Amino acid sequence: MFTPEQIETIHLQDSYTIMYLLLSRQIIQELGDEGETVVREATRRYGRDRGRKRRQKHLDLNVKINMHSLFGVCSDLPPDPRFRRDRLMLTEEERNSHTLICPMAEVWEKYGAKKSGRIYCEEFHRACYQEYAFG
């Protein structure tokens, strides 16, 4: 059972996921390979923006920029209570985890949008982490 605040977070996360998949799928359907290129670049830009903002917030708080602080200090979004992972390692240099339940992946599956989900995961995370780490 989820709290009212958690339910709001769940609705926000699902709404964002649905918006991304509908937009990305339509762009790719309309423009083909060029559309996929556009979606990938836009997703990387979003990742870089979030990474840059999180980096600046941590610098403003005098937090050392490393993997531990990226995943352990002042998250930029509320955590989705449905998300489950085995965190295998989190140090200043390395993060290793195994995702058990990803609510975004469940939405992509439900909407038949695995391609959009794959693009998001391939492009967003790397761009976000690199921008956070190196600015």
Feature-to-residue mapping (PLM):
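N-terminal accessory segment detector
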Residues: 1-124, 131-134
